[in-house]
Amino acid sequence: MEVEKSKSRHEIREERADYEGSPVREHRDGRRKEKDHRSKDKEKDYDREKIRDKDHRRDKEKERDRKRSRDEDTEKEISRGRDKEREKDKSRDRVKEKDKEKERNRHKDRENERDNEKEKDKDRARVKERASKKSHEDDDETHKAAERYEHSDNRGLNEGGDNVDAASSGKEASALDLQNRILKMREERKKKAEDASDALSWVARSRKIEEKRNAEKQRAQQLSRIFEEQDNLNQGENEDGEDGEHLSGVKVLHGLEKVVEGGAVILTLKDQSVLTDGDVNNEIDMLENVEIGEQKRRNEAYEAAKKKKGIYDDKFNDDPGAEKKMLPQYDEAATDEGIFLDAKGRFTGEAEKKLEELRKRIQGQTTHTFEDLNSSAKVSSDYFSQEEMLKFKKPKKKKQLRKKDKLDLSMLEAEAVASGLGAEDLGSRKDGRRQAMKEEKERIEYEKRSNAYQEAIAKADEASRLLRREQVQPFKRDEDESMVLADDAEDLYKSLEKARRLALIKKEEAGSGPQAVAHLVASSTNQTTDDNTTTGDETQENTVVFTEMGDFVWGLQRENDVRKPESEDVFMEEDVAPKAPVEVKEEHPDGLTEVNDTDMDAAEDSSDTKEITPDENIHEVAVGKGLSGALKLLKDRGTLKEKVEWGGRNMDKKKSKLVGIVDDDGGKESKDKESKDRFKDIRIERTDEFGRTLTPKEAFRLLSHKFHGKGPGKMKEEKRMKQYQEELKLKQMKNSDTPSQSVQRMREAQAQLKTPYLVLSGHVKPGQTSDPQSGFATVEKDVPGSLTPMLGDRKVEHFLGIKRKSEPGNSDTPPKRPKP
């Protein structure tokens, strides 16, 4: 900052005193300098303070930002810690839940163990009760035997005393027997008490055997019920008179064993596609159970997952019993266990035999296989029979061709009569005459066209000959010869112009006068055709018409000039006549402009000043006498091959892909010495069906296709053929033509129509007619009527058939105002 101070009176006095004496002046100057230094020091101090304040503020802002970042970091850490704590809590909860589940399972196991122990205790108590009962029964039996023995002894004592000695001896023997019996019984009781644990195991075994027997009985009962239900169903069908013909030839996808296991099984039609290979699916209908099918697929997936991978399989094993396999992906699928139904919708003989065997197994009967010795067994042979060959071959599907329904003329006539059509139109005698007149008109028009075409061709030939003479001769001419030829050409052009003018005068005289007017009034019906033909002749002989065809040809010429400018110096076999300068005469409402030729003198001047170049776009390039022209033509046609023509994909034809296969031309001399020392490499070249050398990748693809037996698809083959044909067309086409041969087609259409022009309109207008052979539209004709009323000269021209030449001064319609 600059410190501004107002000057005081004292300073003014000091300034005045400066001029009075020099010492005072010096003193004042010193004081001023000191003041200036002080003010500068103050300003510097002020600036320093400002800078310090700014630095202080910046430091404060940085500290604030650091605090904010620290706070954010702390918040993030806190949130992370919370998330970690939540995850830990969740993991703890999961562990607790798992522990609880384990405790529950333990409690359940303990309860089950307790129940099992209780059942075992009950079984032991039952066994003990049974053993005690048996011991009590044995004691009772011993007591009863002792009582009987004592009773018998008492009887013997009462009967007689004579036999006392015999009785005493008998008592001693009986007492010994009783003691022995009692000892045996006691030993048996001890053994039974010891074998109590063995009895429990015996009880468990007996229970399992009983359960198995009960399960077999239940299964046998279920199967018997199933067979009874099937028999009842068959009997009911036979009683009702219903047939199973609608199930004839149907295939059941499941085997009998799986169907019989589950009892009554519901079978449904398997989902199949309606169309196969663009035709109706005529395969056999199949029945399946959804649950059995899903279970079968699960089992197959499980078996496939169980297969071990990476195991060495000896493919060259000579064991005749071993199954030989090539690759696992080419293994044949397992045989399908299906059953076919016969014509009546029942099981076949083989299926019935299997059913009988299953019934016998269920009932427990022995299944003996009986062989019929009288039956002629099938002998296995190494060759197929005719029937087996027919089965082995894949049956071809018959293509269903659509047939057109024949028209029933009698039915159509009856319908027409019923609807009232054809009742009024009974024909007339003049139909034949009208047809003959129509054919005659068409013939006359055709002759006129052909004559005009021949005249145009003759004129073009004459002009081209003159041009050829002018173009070939000027190379080696003297000035005198050129002057003579110029005079001859001038005389020829003048004579041609006079002939044209005489022809026009004759036509105008023939088309004017009272007789011509009367003739035109009499032939008013054919005035449109006559008018068109006369105007057509006039335009062909005296005028030039600019059409879309001319613009199209001009565009073609410009394209070819841009594409191949180097062939301009080659002369063609046939040349077109030079274009004469034209001037616009009048413009018709249909968009065509009529142009007349100018004086021939101006044409001659222009021909002298400009050299006419031959047309290179219409005709083929001349080869000439030299070898370079022939080589160039062969190169353009594709018959001369500079390099190897590769067959394959475009990416495989790159130089980077063919390194080392084809050597470059450069550096041959330097490589000659190295190639002599090296061994010659063996190169195998394969060609495709078109004779082109295959690239290495394409050759490998072909070999792999042959090995695997799987070639490219139909669409790829068609694309490849189409690409090759396009390349062939590009090589063989003419320089002036396109691959679609549009120029050649244009010439063919002109030859058929016999006209030197073509109308390239997209659609046929009301006043035009289309040629049925070429499809091109002809020149437009004047439509006789329109929506606007005809007045004045236009009305007279229409009814009298006269075409007046418009004069610039005589115009009925006023000129249009220009748009602002």
Swiss-Prot record:
Modification Phosphoserine, positions: 22
Ranges of Low complexity composition bias in the record: 525-543
Localization terms from the record: Nucleus
Protein's GO biological process: cotyledon vascular tissue pattern formation; flower development; leaf development; leaf vascular tissue pattern formation; meristem structural organization; mRNA splicing, via spliceosome; phloem or xylem histogenesis; post-embryonic root development
Polar residues: bias regions: 733-744, 767-776
Region (Disordered): 1-177, 210-248, 420-445, 523-544, 564-617, 657-678, 729-748, 762-820
InterPro entries: SNU66/SART1
Biased segments, Acidic residues type: 596-606
Name of this protein: SART-1 family protein DOT2
Functional note: Plays a role in root, shoot and flower development. Probably required for normal root and shoot meristem organization and maintenance and the proper expression of PIN and PLT genes. Involved in leaf vasculature patterning.
Keywords: Coiled coil, Developmental protein, Nucleus, Phosphoprotein
GO cellular component annotations of the record: nucleolus; nucleus
Tissues expressing the protein: Expressed in lateral root cap, columella, meristem and quiescent center (QC). Expressed in young leaves.
